[in-house]
A protein has these predicted regions:
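Active-site neighborhood of HAD-like aspartate-dependent phosphohydrolases
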Residues: 1-35
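Alpha-helix N-cap and loop-to-helix initiation/capping positions
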Residues: 13-17, 50-57, 91-92
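Substrate-recognition element of Asp-dependent hydrolases with the DxDx(T/V) motif
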Residues: 22, 26-59, 72-85, 124
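Conserved hydrophobic residues forming the short capping helix/wall of the S-adenosyl-L-methionine
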Residues: 62-67, 101
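Short helix-capping segments at alpha-helix termini
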Residues: 66-72, 105, 146
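Conserved Lys-Pro-Asp/Glu-containing loop-to-beta segment of HAD-superfamily phosphomonoesterases
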Residues: 88-121
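Acidic, Mg2+-coordinating phosphoryl-transfer loop and its flanking beta/alpha structural elements
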Residues: 113-152
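Short acidic-hydrophobic, aromatic-tinged amphipathic segments that line or gate anion-handling sites
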Residues: 151-159
């Protein structure tokens, strides 16, 4: 929902390409006083497709791009585990969201958690956050599945920012 995704994984900084309007949306929200944090499953680390250093470089590109637009990127929390490792942080489990809540010393009750997959929405529900589906990225496929009650649906991250900023 921030960058183009691939079933073959995004393995290099050169492959990390933002979706149209996503970086501007994050910067607009940030400039308006919103904290934008990211919770992301990164099983490509466990699979050996890329290194932590490469992932951190991708995250730095995200931070730099948002900063160039006058915004600030908040915490980027990621799960490095594979789907069969039994960790507590891989979405749909709430571990990544709990890390974000602890970092900001806040409750996530009612906080908007925006994602493009069912596991994103399930993680939101697990911490009593507001599940928000964007149809960009893998969201169109997700929209066809049964969604958690009260899921809000928007075209993309820009539409979410437009709604929140009124």
């Amino acid at each position: 929902m921030i960058n183009y995704d691939s079933d073959a994984y995004i393995k290099t900084v050169a492959e990390w390409i933002p979706l149209p309007g996503a970086l501007d949306a994050i910067a607009r929200l940030s400039r308006a006083g919103w904290t934008v944090a990211v919770a992301t499953n990164q099983s490509g680390l466990a699979r050996g497709y890329y290194s932590v250093a490469t992932l951190e470089s991708m995250h730095q590109v995200l931070r730099d791009e948002v900063q160039q637009r006058g915004g600030a990127m908040g915490l980027i929390s990621y799960c490095p585990h594979g789907p069969d490792e039994g960790c507590a942080c891989r979405k749909p489990l709430p571990g990544l969201l709990t890390q974000i809540a602890e970092h900001y010393q806040t409750s996530l009750d009612g906080v908007w958690f925006v994602g493009d997959s069912l596991r994103d929405l399930q993680a939101a529900v697990a911490v009593n956050a507001q599940p928000v589906l964007v149809c960009s990225g893998k969201g169109e496929q997700t929209r066809e599945k049964p969604l958690p009650d009260n899921t809000l649906i928007f075209a993309d991250l820009s539409a979410v920012a437009d709604h929140l900023l009124g």
